[in-house]
């Protein structure tokens, strides 16, 4: 479900976006394995095609097999089959237009991760050398 109003007579902001999406995964016996929702609390799309958004993402998961997680170099934890976990994650993402000579896109995400927490920062830089010729970097 998406709602995307366009402000009138605004030279800076082209459109606001608000959305709710959901996904439910089941086994062949119709037992729930995972349920996730993404609530886009706010997204602003600028006239120059730049964007910024804030998302809220609750998720529920029941492991159908043991799951190994690396918690540090050389240290692993195995989560048992059948264990159930509820996550609540938040995300801020951004993107500038690829029409720019130097463009940025990325995200910061934080929140629950199985029996702990996780923070993730991703930022990519794109250089437009010539029209149609790009160099992409990722960090």
Could you say what each language-model-derived stretch is?
Residues 2-139:
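Exposed, low-structure sequence patches enriched in small/polar residues
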């Amino acid at each position: 479900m998406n709602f995307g109003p366009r402000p009138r007579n605004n030279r800076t902001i082209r459109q606001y976006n608000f959305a709710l999406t959901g996904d439910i995964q089941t086994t062949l016996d119709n037992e729930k394995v995972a349920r996730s929702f993404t609530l886009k609390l706010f997204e602003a799309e600028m006239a120059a095609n730049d964007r910024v958004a804030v998302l809220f993402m609750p998720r529920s998961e029941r492991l159908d097999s043991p799951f190994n997680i690396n918690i540090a170099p050389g240290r692993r934890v195995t989560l048992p089959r059948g264990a159930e976990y509820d996550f609540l994650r938040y995300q801020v993402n951004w993107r500038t237009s690829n029409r720019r000579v130097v463009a940025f896109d990325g995200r910061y995400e934080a929140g629950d991760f199985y029996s702990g927490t996780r923070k993730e920062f991703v930022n990519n830089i794109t250089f437009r050398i010539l029209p149609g010729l790009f160099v992409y970097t990722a960090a």
